[in-house]
Swiss-Prot record:
Disulfide bridge positions per record: 144-155, 172-264, 243-256
Induction: Overexpressed in atherosclerotic lesions.
Residues annotated as transmembrane: 32-54
Sequence ranges on the Extracellular membrane side: 55-274
Name of the protein in its database record: Oxidized low-density lipoprotein receptor 1
Lipid-anchored residues (S-palmitoyl cysteine): 36, 46
Gene: OLR1
Domain (C-type lectin): residue spans on this chain: 151-265
Length: 274
Protein backbone atom coordinates (compact mmCIF):
# COMPACT_ATOMS: atom_id res chain seq x y z
CA UNK A 1 0.00 0.00 0.00
CA UNK A 2 1.25 3.41 -0.93
CA UNK A 3 1.88 6.22 1.51
CA UNK A 4 -0.60 8.32 -0.23
CA UNK A 5 -3.16 5.83 0.48
CA UNK A 6 -2.57 6.38 4.25
CA UNK A 7 -3.24 10.13 4.17
CA UNK A 8 -6.20 11.33 5.84
CA UNK A 9 -8.93 12.20 3.71
CA UNK A 10 -10.11 15.71 3.87
CA UNK A 11 -13.19 16.45 5.95
CA UNK A 12 -15.12 17.31 3.01
CA UNK A 13 -14.73 13.85 1.79
CA UNK A 14 -16.39 12.60 4.98
CA UNK A 15 -20.08 12.44 5.02
CA UNK A 16 -21.66 15.51 6.69
CA UNK A 17 -24.05 14.60 9.32
CA UNK A 18 -25.90 17.89 8.93
CA UNK A 19 -26.18 17.21 5.28
CA UNK A 20 -27.94 14.09 6.01
CA UNK A 21 -30.57 16.08 7.93
CA UNK A 22 -30.07 14.19 11.18
CA UNK A 23 -29.41 15.77 14.70
CA UNK A 24 -27.62 14.21 17.57
CA UNK A 25 -29.82 12.57 20.08
CA UNK A 26 -28.26 14.30 23.14
CA UNK A 27 -28.98 17.76 21.85
CA UNK A 28 -32.54 17.13 20.89
CA UNK A 29 -34.01 18.71 24.18
CA UNK A 30 -31.87 21.82 24.01
CA UNK A 31 -33.12 22.50 20.62
CA UNK A 32 -36.71 22.11 21.78
CA UNK A 33 -38.81 25.28 21.81
CA UNK A 34 -40.16 24.50 25.39
CA UNK A 35 -36.81 24.49 27.10
CA UNK A 36 -36.65 28.15 28.03
CA UNK A 37 -40.09 28.41 29.63
CA UNK A 38 -39.49 25.22 31.58
CA UNK A 39 -36.20 26.51 32.87
CA UNK A 40 -37.81 29.77 33.90
CA UNK A 41 -40.64 27.94 35.63
CA UNK A 42 -38.20 25.67 37.41
CA UNK A 43 -36.17 28.64 38.55
CA UNK A 44 -39.25 30.39 39.78
CA UNK A 45 -40.29 27.21 41.58
CA UNK A 46 -36.90 26.87 43.19
CA UNK A 47 -36.92 30.53 44.15
CA UNK A 48 -40.41 30.15 45.62
CA UNK A 49 -39.33 27.05 47.50
CA UNK A 50 -36.30 28.92 48.80
CA UNK A 51 -38.44 31.84 49.85
CA UNK A 52 -40.89 29.45 51.50
CA UNK A 53 -38.05 27.75 53.34
CA UNK A 54 -36.69 31.12 54.43
CA UNK A 55 -40.12 32.25 55.59
CA UNK A 56 -40.73 28.97 57.38
CA UNK A 57 -37.32 29.28 59.01
CA UNK A 58 -38.09 32.81 60.12
CA UNK A 59 -41.49 31.71 61.44
CA UNK A 60 -39.80 28.79 63.19
CA UNK A 61 -37.35 31.19 64.80
CA UNK A 62 -40.23 33.44 65.82
CA UNK A 63 -42.14 30.48 67.24
CA UNK A 64 -38.98 29.30 69.01
CA UNK A 65 -38.42 32.76 70.49
CA UNK A 66 -42.08 32.93 71.47
CA UNK A 67 -41.85 29.51 73.10
CA UNK A 68 -38.70 30.55 74.94
CA UNK A 69 -40.40 33.75 76.09
CA UNK A 70 -43.49 31.83 77.18
CA UNK A 71 -41.28 29.29 78.96
CA UNK A 72 -39.48 32.12 80.71
CA UNK A 73 -42.83 33.68 81.63
CA UNK A 74 -44.08 30.33 82.90
CA UNK A 75 -40.90 29.84 84.92
CA UNK A 76 -41.26 33.34 86.33
CA UNK A 77 -44.92 32.77 87.15
CA UNK A 78 -44.05 29.41 88.70
CA UNK A 79 -41.37 31.04 90.84
CA UNK A 80 -43.80 33.78 91.84
CA UNK A 81 -46.47 31.18 92.62
CA UNK A 82 -44.01 29.11 94.66
CA UNK A 83 -43.03 32.26 96.54
CA UNK A 84 -46.67 33.09 97.16
CA UNK A 85 -47.37 29.51 98.33
CA UNK A 86 -44.32 29.60 100.60
CA UNK A 87 -45.34 32.99 101.95
CA UNK A 88 -48.88 31.71 102.50
CA UNK A 89 -47.56 28.61 104.28
CA UNK A 90 -45.34 30.78 106.46
CA UNK A 91 -48.27 33.10 107.14
CA UNK A 92 -50.47 30.11 108.06
CA UNK A 93 -47.74 28.73 110.33
CA UNK A 94 -47.33 32.15 111.95
CA UNK A 95 -51.11 32.43 112.28
CA UNK A 96 -51.34 29.00 113.90
CA UNK A 97 -48.53 29.90 116.29
CA UNK A 98 -50.25 33.18 117.11
CA UNK A 99 -53.54 31.35 117.67
CA UNK A 100 -51.81 28.84 119.94
CA UNK A 101 -50.14 31.62 121.94
CA UNK A 102 -53.42 33.53 122.08
CA UNK A 103 -55.24 30.40 123.26
CA UNK A 104 -52.64 29.82 125.97
CA UNK A 105 -52.91 33.46 127.00
CA UNK A 106 -56.71 33.23 127.14
CA UNK A 107 -56.52 30.04 129.21
CA UNK A 108 -54.01 31.66 131.57
CA UNK A 109 -56.16 34.77 131.93
CA UNK A 110 -59.27 32.64 132.46
CA UNK A 111 -57.48 30.65 135.15
CA UNK A 112 -56.30 33.82 136.87
CA UNK A 113 -59.78 35.31 136.61
CA UNK A 114 -61.28 32.17 138.11
CA UNK A 115 -58.76 32.26 140.96
CA UNK A 116 -59.47 35.94 141.57
CA UNK A 117 -63.22 35.27 141.46
CA UNK A 118 -62.87 32.48 144.01
CA UNK A 119 -60.69 34.70 146.18
CA UNK A 120 -63.20 37.53 145.85
CA UNK A 121 -66.05 35.19 146.80
CA UNK A 122 -64.03 33.98 149.78
CA UNK A 123 -63.35 37.56 150.85
CA UNK A 124 -67.03 38.42 150.47
CA UNK A 125 -67.94 35.38 152.56
CA UNK A 126 -65.44 36.40 155.23
CA UNK A 127 -66.78 39.95 155.13
CA UNK A 128 -70.35 38.73 155.63
CA UNK A 129 -69.23 36.48 158.47
CA UNK A 130 -67.40 39.41 160.05
CA UNK A 131 -70.48 41.59 159.77
CA UNK A 132 -72.58 38.84 161.33
CA UNK A 133 -70.03 38.44 164.12
CA UNK A 134 -70.06 42.19 164.74
CA UNK A 135 -73.85 42.13 164.95
CA UNK A 136 -73.69 39.29 167.44
CA UNK A 137 -71.07 41.15 169.45
CA UNK A 138 -73.30 44.23 169.59
CA UNK A 139 -76.03 42.09 171.14
CA UNK A 140 -73.62 39.97 173.14
CA UNK A 141 -73.61 40.60 176.88
CA UNK A 142 -71.00 37.95 177.65
CA UNK A 143 -70.70 34.17 177.71
CA UNK A 144 -72.49 33.91 181.06
CA UNK A 145 -75.38 35.72 182.73
CA UNK A 146 -74.76 38.17 185.53
CA UNK A 147 -73.41 36.68 188.79
CA UNK A 148 -72.32 33.49 186.98
CA UNK A 149 -68.68 32.41 186.76
CA UNK A 150 -67.26 31.53 183.36
CA UNK A 151 -64.78 28.71 182.90
CA UNK A 152 -64.07 26.94 179.62
CA UNK A 153 -67.32 26.03 177.94
CA UNK A 154 -69.50 26.30 181.06
CA UNK A 155 -71.00 28.86 183.39
CA UNK A 156 -71.29 28.24 187.15
CA UNK A 157 -73.57 29.80 189.78
CA UNK A 158 -72.97 29.38 193.51
CA UNK A 159 -76.32 29.61 195.27
CA UNK A 160 -76.92 32.03 198.10
CA UNK A 161 -79.42 29.77 199.91
CA UNK A 162 -79.30 26.24 201.25
CA UNK A 163 -81.74 23.51 200.23
CA UNK A 164 -81.85 19.72 200.11
CA UNK A 165 -80.54 17.97 197.02
CA UNK A 166 -83.87 17.69 195.16
CA UNK A 167 -84.82 21.32 195.85
CA UNK A 168 -81.38 22.42 194.69
CA UNK A 169 -81.89 20.41 191.52
CA UNK A 170 -85.23 22.16 190.91
CA UNK A 171 -83.63 25.58 191.46
CA UNK A 172 -81.01 24.84 188.81
CA UNK A 173 -83.65 23.56 186.39
CA UNK A 174 -85.59 26.81 186.82
CA UNK A 175 -82.46 28.64 185.63
CA UNK A 176 -82.18 26.40 182.56
CA UNK A 177 -79.20 24.66 184.18
CA UNK A 178 -78.30 21.53 186.12
CA UNK A 179 -76.37 20.69 189.26
CA UNK A 180 -72.59 20.62 188.97
CA UNK A 181 -71.15 17.89 186.73
CA UNK A 182 -67.39 17.29 186.61
CA UNK A 183 -66.06 15.56 183.50
CA UNK A 184 -62.35 16.40 183.58
CA UNK A 185 -59.52 17.14 185.97
CA UNK A 186 -59.49 20.70 184.59
CA UNK A 187 -63.09 21.27 185.66
CA UNK A 188 -62.33 19.62 189.02
CA UNK A 189 -59.36 21.95 189.59
CA UNK A 190 -61.50 25.03 188.87
CA UNK A 191 -64.25 23.93 191.31
CA UNK A 192 -61.74 22.98 194.01
CA UNK A 193 -60.10 26.40 193.73
CA UNK A 194 -63.47 28.18 193.79
CA UNK A 195 -64.63 26.34 196.94
CA UNK A 196 -61.32 26.21 198.78
CA UNK A 197 -61.94 29.55 200.52
CA UNK A 198 -65.46 28.68 201.67
CA UNK A 199 -66.45 26.46 204.56
CA UNK A 200 -69.96 25.84 203.16
CA UNK A 201 -70.88 22.55 201.50
CA UNK A 202 -72.22 22.66 197.90
CA UNK A 203 -74.40 19.98 196.38
CA UNK A 204 -73.18 18.34 193.13
CA UNK A 205 -75.29 16.60 190.53
CA UNK A 206 -73.92 13.20 191.58
CA UNK A 207 -76.00 10.66 193.54
CA UNK A 208 -76.61 6.96 193.99
CA UNK A 209 -79.95 5.33 194.49
CA UNK A 210 -81.70 1.99 194.28
CA UNK A 211 -81.50 -0.60 192.92
CA UNK A 212 -77.73 -0.86 192.30
CA UNK A 213 -76.58 2.24 194.16
CA UNK A 214 -74.12 3.26 191.42
CA UNK A 215 -72.82 6.80 191.30
CA UNK A 216 -74.60 8.56 188.44
CA UNK A 217 -74.85 12.14 187.26
CA UNK A 218 -78.19 13.80 186.60
CA UNK A 219 -78.11 12.89 182.90
CA UNK A 220 -77.55 9.20 183.80
CA UNK A 221 -73.86 9.07 182.84
CA UNK A 222 -71.55 7.22 185.28
CA UNK A 223 -68.77 8.79 187.30
CA UNK A 224 -65.37 8.60 185.61
CA UNK A 225 -63.04 6.25 187.53
CA UNK A 226 -60.24 7.87 189.51
CA UNK A 227 -61.52 11.39 188.76
CA UNK A 228 -61.65 12.19 192.47
CA UNK A 229 -61.79 10.32 195.79
CA UNK A 230 -64.57 10.61 198.35
CA UNK A 231 -63.62 11.75 201.82
CA UNK A 232 -65.19 10.22 204.93
CA UNK A 233 -67.68 7.33 205.02
CA UNK A 234 -69.29 6.55 201.67
CA UNK A 235 -70.57 3.04 202.29
CA UNK A 236 -73.67 4.09 204.18
CA UNK A 237 -76.89 4.00 202.20
CA UNK A 238 -79.88 6.24 202.95
CA UNK A 239 -83.52 5.54 202.04
CA UNK A 240 -83.80 8.88 200.29
CA UNK A 241 -80.49 8.31 198.52
CA UNK A 242 -76.88 9.28 198.95
CA UNK A 243 -75.75 12.52 197.30
CA UNK A 244 -72.30 14.05 196.77
CA UNK A 245 -71.22 17.53 197.80
CA UNK A 246 -67.93 19.43 197.70
CA UNK A 247 -66.49 21.40 200.59
CA UNK A 248 -63.12 23.15 200.70
CA UNK A 249 -62.11 21.32 197.55
CA UNK A 250 -62.93 17.83 198.87
CA UNK A 251 -65.83 15.58 197.84
CA UNK A 252 -68.08 13.93 200.44
CA UNK A 253 -71.21 11.73 200.42
CA UNK A 254 -74.24 12.44 202.62
CA UNK A 255 -77.98 11.94 202.99
CA UNK A 256 -79.82 13.75 200.18
CA UNK A 257 -82.42 15.21 202.56
CA UNK A 258 -79.85 17.39 204.29
CA UNK A 259 -79.63 21.04 203.29
CA UNK A 260 -76.60 22.66 201.71
CA UNK A 261 -75.70 25.26 199.16
CA UNK A 262 -75.48 24.20 195.52
CA UNK A 263 -73.59 24.86 192.31
CA UNK A 264 -75.59 25.19 189.10
CA UNK A 265 -73.95 24.66 185.72
CA UNK A 266 -74.91 25.38 182.10
CA UNK A 267 -73.25 25.88 178.72
CA UNK A 268 -71.57 29.22 178.10
CA UNK A 269 -72.86 31.37 175.25
CA UNK A 270 -69.68 31.48 173.18
CA UNK A 271 -69.29 33.30 169.88
CA UNK A 272 -68.61 30.85 167.08
CA UNK A 273 -66.08 31.79 164.42
CA UNK A 274 -67.32 30.73 160.97
Amino acid sequence: MAVDDLKVKPMKDQPDQKSNGKKPKGLRFLSSPWWCPAAVALGVLCLGSLMTIIMLGMQLLQVSDLLKQQQANLTLQENILEGQVLAQQQAEAASQESQRELKEMIETLAKRLDEKSKKQMELNHQYLNLQEALKRMDNFSGPCPEDWLWHGKNCYLFSSGSFNWESSQEKCLSLDAQLLKINSTEDLGFIQQATSHSSFPFWMGLSRRKPDYSWLWEDGSPLMPHLFRFQGAVSQRYPSGTCAYIQKGNVFAENCILVAYSICQKKANLLRSE
